[in-house]
Design a protein with these regions (language model features):
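Bacterial N-terminal signal peptides that target proteins for export
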Residues: 2-15
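Boundary/entry segment of secreted carbohydrate-active catalytic domains
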Residues: 30-69, 73
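Structural preference for beta-strand elements that scaffold enzyme active sites
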Residues: 40-44, 69-71, 106-108, 155-159, ...
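Acidic-and-aromatic substrate-binding clefts and catalytic sites of carbohydrate-active enzymes
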Residues: 46-57, 78-91, 165-170, 207-216, ...
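Bacterial N-terminal signal peptides
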Residues: 12-26
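Aromatic-rich peripheral "rim/lid" segments of glycoside hydrolase catalytic domains that contact
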Residues: 117-121, 129, 150, 159-182, ...
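Substrate-binding cleft and catalytic face of glycoside hydrolase catalytic domains
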Residues: 65, 69-83, 92-209, 275
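Short, acidic/polar
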Residues: 50-65, 138-147, 213-224, 314-320
Length: 385
């Protein structure tokens, strides 16, 4: 407490600095997320550059006070860290890792192999034509060995492959698959393990709660396991709706992956309270819909009744997660405050979204208190309906 008290008399602190100090002091006085669930699983957030560099003092303060694990929102993705064939830019990633280390956090690397946010040059030659299998494998190996090797012993786990499946559970026909073949996944995990044998390796995807895609993911994991790959866990991204998935379906999903021999993480958690722009539950980044007033109804704030519904939805979710604490190892929110959320600009750019536990000013929402409360209640396993 003394370190915080020394800051208070500094009268020239800007408004954001005052808010940060208040957040830090409040965090000392109330139960934090990481303390509430310390016997259950890690709790964290995805940080953007403004958060881990301190430019967004509010987000940085919340992260320090509330989280014991962090993921980078964008700064370890290929287009950011390896924009040109002979150019790596580790400046932001190094700061992210330093932030995590200074605050004693478990650091997750996101992501090594994805079909989005990967530069075109990775898949093309100088004439813009697709490269050969051998060339792409070499580029994959060099990238993974360089990035994972740089943070060996610092980043504890990696989302090695992200979003490799279609909604029916089949392999997505990505450039990786088209050029290398289905064994691109095997190679990616082998290269990552070679670069850091101690790091945990994960598969990460959205809508794994849906039966067909879940079955495809389990089949993929079992195939890789049979080939000698040790996948430590699967990431359910957790871009959830107010009516999807049900607690029973989430419970069923966790149990299915547990039976496959992997632990489960919720890796990109948010809860969209806004009207759906599409029937799809998929968090497909390519989706883009025109801004309409009916899709953006809460520009002046979230009504109390919606706040309470959101709080109950989060409480129901965390009740299931705590019930499955033996399988669930981590819950990571995709952002820190509502103002940080990607849902302000996806799938409709320019909306006012409210998907997280903290308001734009950094104050906790009713959903925060509802989540904390679930850690204090007796839990009994929930049977799938």
């Amino acid at each position: 407490m003394k370190t915080h008290q020394k800051i208070i008399p500094t009268l020239w602190i800007p408004l954001t600095g005052i808010l940060t100090v208040n957040l830090l002091l409040n965090a000392c006085a109330q139960t934090t997320l990481k303390d509430a669930f310390k016997k259950d699983f890690l709790v964290g957030g995805a940080l953007n550059q403004a958060a881990f560099t301190g430019q967004n003092a509010t987000a940085a303060a919340i992260a320090r006070a509330q989280f014991d694990t962090i993921s980078p929102e964008n700064d370890l993705k290929w287009e950011h860290i390896h924009p040109q064939p002979d150019q790596y830019d580790f400046s932001a990633a190094d700061q992210f890792v330093e932030f995590g280390q200074k605050n004693g956090m478990f650091i997750v690397g996101h992501t090594l192999i994805w079909h989005w946010q990967t530069p075109k040059w990775v898949f093309q030659d100088d004439q813009g034509k697709p490269v050969s299998r051998d060339v792409l494998l070499t580029r994959m190996h060099n990238h993974i060995s360089t990035v994972v090797g740089r943070y060996k012993g610092k980043i504890g786990a990696w989302d090695v492959v992200n979003e490799a499946l279609n909604e029916d559970g089949s392999l997505r026909d990505s450039p990786w698959k088209k050029i290398i073949g289905e064994d691109y996944l095997l190679k990616a995990y082998q290269f990552a393990h070679e670069a850091d044998p101690q790091a945990e390796l994960y598969y990460n995807d959205y809508t794994l709660e849906n039966a067909s895609k879940r079955a495809g993911a389990i089949a993929l994991i079992k195939k890789l396991q049979s080939q000698g790959v040790h996948i430590a866990g699967v990431g359910l991204q957790g871009h959830y709706k107010m009516d999807w998935p049900s607690p029973a379906v989430l419970s069923e999903t966790i149990e299915a992956f547990s039976a496959a021999g992997v632990k489960v993480m919720i890796t990109e958690l948010d809860m969209d309270v806004l009207p759906a722009a599409t029937w799809s539950q998929a968090a497909e980044v390519s989706m883009n819909f025109k801004l309409q007033a009916k899709l953006n109804p809460y520009t002046k704030g979230l009504p109390d009744n919606v706040q309470q519904t959101l709080a109950k939805r989060y409480a129901d979710l965390f009740t299931v997660l705590v019930q499955h604490r033996d399988t669930v190892s981590r819950v990571t929110f995709w952002g820190v405050t509502d103002g940080d959320s990607w849902l302000n600009n996806w799938p409709v750019r320019g909306r006012t979204a409210y998907p997280l536990l903290f308001n734009r000013d950094g104050s906790p929402k009713p959903a925060f208190n509802a989540v904390i409360q679930t850690s204090k209640e007796p839990q009994t396993p929930q049977k799938p309906m």
